[in-house]
Amino acid sequence: MSRVCQVTGKKPMVGNNRSHAKNATRRRFLPNLQNHRFWLEDEKRFVQLRVSTKGMRIIDKKGIEVVVAELRARGEKV
């Protein structure tokens, strides 16, 4: 499973570690992804999404039904 948030589309990005001597070594910044089950009231079932914590805040704000409708409009299987 890829490290991509299903709601926001956040992906890993690449940058540098910096030591005290300012030496640069490449590293990846990973999104804070969580597997989370959300209850869909109108379908009477749970859906499991891989979302970032920012995505969870968006779901809290908009509502899970609206977010799932947007995912389905994009063609994602939910």
UniProtKB/Swiss-Prot annotation:
Keywords: Ribonucleoprotein, Ribosomal protein
A GO BP annotation: translation
Pfam families per UniProt: Ribosomal_L28 (PF00830)
Gene Ontology CC entries for this record: cytosolic large ribosomal subunit
InterPro entries: Ribosomal_bL28 (IPR026569), Ribosomal_bL28/bL31-like_sf (IPR034704), Ribosomal_bL28_bact-type (IPR001383), Ribosomal_bL28_sf (IPR037147)
Region annotated Disordered, chain positions: 1-21
GO MF annotation terms: structural constituent of ribosome
Family of this protein: Belongs to the bacterial ribosomal protein bL28 family.
Protein name: Large ribosomal subunit protein bL28
Organism: Shewanella loihica (strain ATCC BAA-1088 / PV-4)
Gene: rpmB
